[in-house]
């Protein structure tokens, strides 16, 4: 059977879609790739030339490393995989960002000046530190490509999960209303003819089966499709939601091609 994708919601940072005719292992592979295997840019080193703020150098470096950066996966390579410099650092695998600020005022992520105009903080209003009168902050930050499996700062997918597509059947209901009262999602309504669930609300079901447990006549049954999954994901801004899913799929494709190449040599 051919894999099917039905997009339910899509914005720059989040998406919700139904992935059908795939195994649980494949669905989990997509989720894991979005979280751990799609490389992103994040600040790795910070050279502090002047810091008279209330924060220690190490605290500033940590805050800077956790600021998501818009990533161009076509231009930059993870440093360990860079053929240009052999992992020493070069324009093909790293980006320089500078910052110079003097108080009074709050320093924000938008104050970082990138050597590559395409690489900017995904959120311009992330506060870094508040400077009082006379305090200064001058630094250079070096951003590298990396993987979420190595550090959370390189994790592009911040909220990626899936569940099996629910299947709910209602037969011979006596309209007692117990199932509707027990449903934590509030998706069951009761009419004179019996309990009812709107088609668009079925995906909200968490498959807790509380409605089954309170039904004395076993009129309602909750199950799920084993090969259909409802995905919900959010990006940290390194990529758009669409690009993150596509890059995750390409990661899985690349691994499969590598395995086939190895098997062909046997």
From Swiss-Prot:
Its cofactor is [3Fe-4S] cluster. SMART domains: RPOLD. It is found in: Cytoplasm. Its main location: cytoplasm. One of its GO terms (cellular component) is DNA-directed RNA polymerase complex. Binds 1 [3Fe-4S] cluster. One of its GO terms (molecular function) is oxidoreductase activity. Its EC number is 2.7.7.6. GO terms for biological process: DNA-templated transcription. It is an enzyme of class 2 (transferase). [3Fe-4S] cluster binds at residues 205, 208, 211. Keywords: 3Fe-4S, Cytoplasm, DNA-directed RNA polymerase, Iron, Iron-sulfur, Metal-binding, Nucleotidyltransferase, Transcription, Transferase. InterPro entries: 4Fe4S_Fe-S-bd, 4Fe4S_Fe_S_CS, DNA-dir_RNA_pol_30-40kDasu_CS, DNA-dir_RNA_pol_insert, DNA-dir_RNA_pol_RpoA/D/Rpb3, RBP11-like, RNAP_Rpo3/Rpb3/RPAC1, RNApol_insert_sf. Coiled coil: none annotated. The keyword Coiled coil does not apply. It catalyses: RNA(n) + a ribonucleoside 5'-triphosphate = RNA(n+1) + diphosphate. Belongs to the archaeal Rpo3/eukaryotic RPB3 RNA polymerase subunit family. DNA-dependent RNA polymerase (RNAP) catalyzes the transcription of DNA into RNA using the four ribonucleoside triphosphates as substrates. Part of the RNA polymerase complex. This is DNA-directed RNA polymerase subunit Rpo3. The lineage of its organism: Archaea, Methanobacteriati, Methanobacteriota, Stenosarchaea group, Methanomicrobia. The gene is rpo3.
